[in-house]
Every structure is written in structure tokens, then in C-alpha cells.
């Protein structure tokens, strides 16, 4: 087992190792004095892992209840959030108890938001089962639900007590969901780790899972340590997301998050090359690795349709938006951009 320690407003460990799921009960018992744990999962993940995790928690002496919701981004909404709060009340969880998210990013965001707001905060554990959640959304303390105006517009910063990453979970992932995670992995390499980028070009993600997870969470740990509340350098982690959220919204969330981030990265590096902020070689190298991992790189939507969602981006401040722009492989910068120029960036990136 590998351990990455995070020191933020709450210090905790990210543990990475095969078979961790079966020992989740003892791992959780060691970091919390909770008597009761609410497992939060979706109806795709629960049949695969819910029983094993429940048994592990019960064997460790914990009382377990569960909340299972329909899988998909559409469940990351106020309605499901309120249903979860009602379930916590019905099961009489107290401040001494805990919520454990079992699943991908939607489960983690939803459970984390509930944990941070129910009784003004109870224990929270992340047990991610997708590559995307392991390398990104389960680490760093961001929780959120979506609003009609866009993604992640209501949320909190709330660090978990513990994160358990079991690469064995990834063996059951459909290939398209695995590819989604690869988009976030490539994001880390592009924004700040050229040697890691070379590793990804040289081999497949399946062959180096532990290395990939440890590298990504360590990078995120280091960035979060400098800027826990997303006011400065942490915004670099949103590479590909500003335009990606516009793509998700325009597709009615038919385009997955990872695919949208991949297209968003490709758009941003194309625009950067068009505006002289990176070389054409950098542009082509980034687009090529996305293609190597069978990720989409072309935008099918009109700039006019994407614009409203992009302008609602969390990195907007007044009449400007901070764009995360690649300047070389392994280097990005934050470019403060007038809202009036965002349409030009979308078109330069390839929006119709």
C-alpha cells in the first residue's frame, strides 16, 4: 500500500493499494470514532461493491445504512441532495457519525456536500471506484451539486477524513468510463509534469495504474496545500474544464465529463497556439496524446451556444474569466481574460 498525506484545513491520508476495499471497515475505524456510517452510492456501483463494503464495515463493528441513487450526472442535483439529507435524518445520524461515498465523482460530490452541511458537518470518507474519482474528484475537498445554470455552482470546501483508492475496482470499469479518467490524468501531465507526460506517451494507462494514481494525487496534494480554497494556483487544475463544462451543458450531459475535458483541453491549446501563447508543436503534441488515448478532440457545438455556460464559470470575477492556458507541455498559466473576448477564444479553439 502507498500512502499520500494531505495537510490542509484537515489532515488526512490517501491510501492506494489493491484489496483495500475488503479492508475498508478497519481502515475507517482507525480514523473515526463513528458508530454509524451511511454508504452513498449509485445503482451501477452498488451491486458491484456495496455488499463487500457493507460487510467490511459491519465486521469492524459499525452500524451501516445506505442511500443508493440513479447513476449519472442528472442525480447531482438539489432534489437528490435533499433526499439524502432526509435519509440521514431518518437514520438518525449524529455529528459523531459519518458518510462514506462509494463510487465515482457524482457520488463523491453529492455525499461530500451532504456531509459538509448536515448538522453543519459530520465525518466523510471517500472510496472512489473510477479512475477519474481516484486521481481527481476524491482529493482536495471540493464538494458540489449542479444547478440549472451550470455544473458545481452550489458547493463547499470540506476535506475528507480518509480516501481509499483500490485499483482492483478499475477492472470492472467499462472502457469508456476508464477513458474518462485518462482525460484527467493527461490534464495533470499537461499542466505541470513533463516527465509524467512522457510516461503516458510511452505506455498504456492500464499498465501503470498505481504510478498514475500516486503521481496525480501527489500533484493535486501539493497544489491544494498552496491554495486550498481555489483563489489562485489551484485554478490550474481546471485546465480543460471551462470549455468542457460548456460542452457538457450543450450536449444535455450526453457528452461525459472526461470527454468534455479532453475536448476542452484540445480547444484551449488550439486557441493558445492561435494567439501565440504556445507553439504549434505544443498544440500538436497535446492533441496527439488525447487521440492516443482514444479521447475526442473536436467540438461539435456553436460558440454562441457554449458561451452562457462558460460565462458562468467559477473562475469568473466581475467582467473577466481566468482561463487556464497551456504554454508548453508541463506548463500552464492563468490568463485573465475579458468576458467580451471569450467568444474569440471559443472560435479559435474550434467551436463552430
State where each predicted segment sits.
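Solvent-exposed alpha-helices and their adjacent loops that cap or buttress functional pockets
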Residues: 31, 92-94, 117-119, 146-147, ...
